[in-house]
Amino acid sequence: MALKYSFKARLWHYPEEAGWYFLTLPEDLAAEIREDTAPFRRGFGSVKVTATVSGQSWSTSLFPDSKSSSYLLPVKKAIRVAAGIGVGDQVHVRLGVSEAD
């Protein structure tokens, strides 16, 4: 069975020269995902997902973030460019998690 979620968040940049770009999941959604995926989470608590933003889909992982008590979704450059999004933009995201992964 595939688990499906959606949320809105602002894109932000990790402050380093070659820093990553992330979306932080809302805490309540992170708690739901944490509970739903407990039996099949990967190393360091990461969760394999398929993410979709503005019609652009990619496979990645959610990474737990103790600072925000949530998960971080990395957004690679190709997706940011194709979706036309930048730092500070409010982004609607759909996530799919397969229990078989």
List where the protein language model places each region.
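Short alpha-helix capping/helix-loop boundary micro-motifs
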Residues: 37, 76-81
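A conserved hydrophobic position in a structured secondary element of the catalytic/binding core
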Residues: 25, 74-75
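Short active-site loop/helix that positions an aromatic residue
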Residues: 80-88
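Long, compositionally biased stretches
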Residues: 1-69, 87-90, 94-96, 100-101
